[in-house]
Amino acid sequence: MISTERLTHLKQLEAESIHIIREVVAEFSNPVMMYSVGKDSAVMLHLALKAFAPAKLPFPLLHVDTLWKFKEMIAFRDQRAKEEGFELLVHTNPEGVAMNISPFTHGSAVHTDIMKTQGLKQALNKYKFDAVFGGARRDEEKSRAKERIYSFRDKNHRWDPKNQRPELWNIYNGRVHKDESIRVFPISNWTELDIWQYIYLEQIPIVPLYFAAKRPVLEKDGVKIMVDDDRMPIGPDDVIKEEMVRFRTLGCYPLTGAVDSTATTLPEIIQEMLLTKTSERQGRVIDNDSAGSMEKKKIEGYF
């Protein structure tokens, strides 16, 4: 019997995402899910757990660790792996470690390329993954807005924005040549507000950094950077202040700006989202390296 129940907006998004996740597992032999520990990763993990419950996830989670993530992110990552019992793969670019790559010394572009992009490509080559789930959304940034749900990559993991396959309705073409792979974005059609509302309704655990609290911050070039450890270079004129801030997006702490906020609960964050007029990625330094920098990074192999 066909159900006549009308799905709510969030339930429609949930159903679409679960369908995509199951479709990839059915089509590909060695999938993996990227786990960056942010809110989008939290939702994607929740959807994957729902898709295969009560069984365990049929694929591992991969975290490319740059060694510059917030300490709270790493603690939360390990805690979730222990709670849910999923297989967690952690990879750090050994060449970057040997060169002592730092966002402070080498700049955001070099750090992101070596520790993130090259680190990711190393992990994908090592484990021979043929499909990689990512938590990118089309409302985040213009290059992601034009990317397909099934995003094809060549043998060097490069993306060609001019060579994308049509996606008609819910039909996805997963055929790839030898050594090619796809990046899959199950939550492409979600917005930032959808993510927060879903987290609230489903009571999904998230990193405490998303909630406002008194935190030590140092303002650099108009961006408030949280002092997360003693590797932060402090100049003679720099002033560290305790301010009520939170993070709308998470990454390497020297490249992620905090925003002034008093939102300490999920309803307050949602209310803030309804009133804000700025992009959630305004605090991501890597997005401002150059014009069209995100698209260039994706063409080089970045997510």
Curated annotation (Swiss-Prot):
Going by the UniProt record, its keywords in alphabetical order are:
ATP-binding, Nucleotide-binding, Nucleotidyltransferase, Transferase
Q: What class of enzyme is it?
A: transferase
What EC number(s) does the entry state?
A: 2.7.7.4
Q: What GO molecular function annotations does the UniProt record carry, in alphabetical order?
A: ATP binding; sulfate adenylyltransferase (ATP) activity
Reactions the enzyme catalyzes: sulfate + ATP + H(+) = adenosine 5'-phosphosulfate + diphosphate
- UniProt-listed GO biological process terms: hydrogen sulfide biosynthetic process; sulfate assimilation
The pathway this protein participates in, as annotated, is: Sulfur metabolism; hydrogen sulfide biosynthesis; sulfite from sulfate: step 1/3
Pfam families in the record: PAPS_reduct (PF01507)
Family, according to the entry, reads as follows: Belongs to the PAPS reductase family. CysD subfamily.
| Role, per record | With CysN forms the ATP sulfurylase (ATPS) that catalyzes the adenylation of sulfate producing adenosine 5'-phosphosulfate (APS) and diphosphate, the first enzymatic step in sulfur assimilation pathway. APS synthesis involves the formation of a high-energy phosphoric-sulfuric acid anhydride bond driven by GTP hydrolysis by CysN coupled to ATP hydrolysis by CysD.
Relate the assembly described in the record. Heterodimer composed of CysD, the smaller subunit, and CysN.
Q: Which PANTHER family match?
A: SULFATE ADENYLYLTRANSFERASE SUBUNIT 2
Name this protein carries in UniProt: Sulfate adenylyltransferase subunit 2
Q: Which gene encodes it?
A: cysD
